[in-house]
């Protein structure tokens, strides 16, 4: 994968997250902001999830209250380089915990 392909795929990931949060119908308030390639999700309780791209490594990084995760693209899924879990699984787990209600991005 070259740099432009990596950025295209990361942009697609950001857009999917943003669209799901724009359509969020849950009880808690969840905000999403993209600034300089960093996506920040802020929850009603003040906690945050930060997602950014690491161009030199072609990785997506996810920072949550539970910890930090690094994802490599394997096939068509972003997979954690430590646990083998998908980006979406870990994001949904963290967002659900931080929102206090079920949050789905799929």
Curated annotation (Swiss-Prot):
Keywords: Iron, Metal-binding
CDD domains: Frataxin
One cellular component (GO) term of this entry: cytosol
Family annotation (InterPro entries): CyaY, Frataxin/CyaY, Frataxin/CyaY_sf, Frataxin_CS
Gene Ontology terms, MF aspect: ferric iron binding; ferrous iron binding
Pfam families on file: Frataxin_Cyay
Entry-linked NCBIfam families: FeS_CyaY
PANTHER family to which the protein is assigned, alphabetical: FRATAXIN, FRATAXIN, MITOCHONDRIAL
Stated name of the protein: Iron-sulfur cluster assembly protein CyaY
Species: Escherichia coli O6:H1 (strain CFT073 / ATCC 700928 / UPEC)
